[in-house]
Amino acid sequence: MATPPSQVRQNYHQDCEAAINRQINLELYASYVYLSMSYYFDRDDVALKNFAKYFLHQSHEEREHAEKLMKLQNQRGGRIFLQDIKKPDRDDWENGLTAMECALHLEKNVNQSLLELHKLATEKNDPHLCDFIETHYLDEQVKAIKQLGDHVTNLRKMGAPKYGMAEYLFDKHTLGESDS
């Protein structure tokens, strides 16, 4: 049975609707990756509780991003079509530096996708979608990328992963004192 057209839909191009659904999938994938990271660092043979806490917080944030997009999709009269969520590329995150580097790469990919979504919204003359992306996503992405870049730099300066003490101290003093 075909889905009836929305009575609230206005100036919402089907390409934007499809792109929002792809972005929802990407945000859920990012949440899934961070969840994998979190429980890797929570393992008894890894035991870096603040890395685990940090990545769990990131997982929740990414899921909230997906939910915000789902709410937008309904508000604009679009239809949500969920896709399979790809499993993370790895199950063993090796060490804190590797995980932070992977997280940085992931956030840059999410940011690029958001920039492309913004470009599409501009091309389709959708100021509401442009404003939504600018207000709720772009600034937060830039801050997340900067924070992860700083974490990668500090872990490298401390000698991670060669010196295990570096990760322990980073876990305790950097991640242990942060709000996330």
UniProtKB/Swiss-Prot annotation:
Xref: InterPro entries: Ferritin, Ferritin-like, Ferritin-like_diiron, Ferritin-like_SF, Ferritin_CS, Ferritin_DPS_dom
Q: Does the keyword Cytoplasm apply?
A: yes
Q: List the disulfide bonds.
A: none
EC number of this enzyme:
1.16.3.1
Gene Ontology cellular-component terms for this entry are: autophagosome; cytoplasm; cytoplasmic vesicle; lysosome
What keywords is this UniProt entry annotated with? Cytoplasm, Cytoplasmic vesicle, Iron, Iron storage, Lysosome, Metal-binding, Oxidoreductase
Q: Describe the subunit structure.
A: Oligomer of 24 subunits. There are two types of subunits: L (light) chain and H (heavy) chain. The major chain can be light or heavy, depending on the species and tissue type. The functional molecule forms a roughly spherical shell with a diameter of 12 nm and contains a central cavity into which the insoluble mineral iron core is deposited.
Name the UniProt record assigns to this protein: Ferritin heavy chain
Organism from which the protein derives: Gallus gallus (Chicken)
Q: What is the lineage of its organism?
A: Eukaryota, Metazoa, Chordata, Craniata, Vertebrata
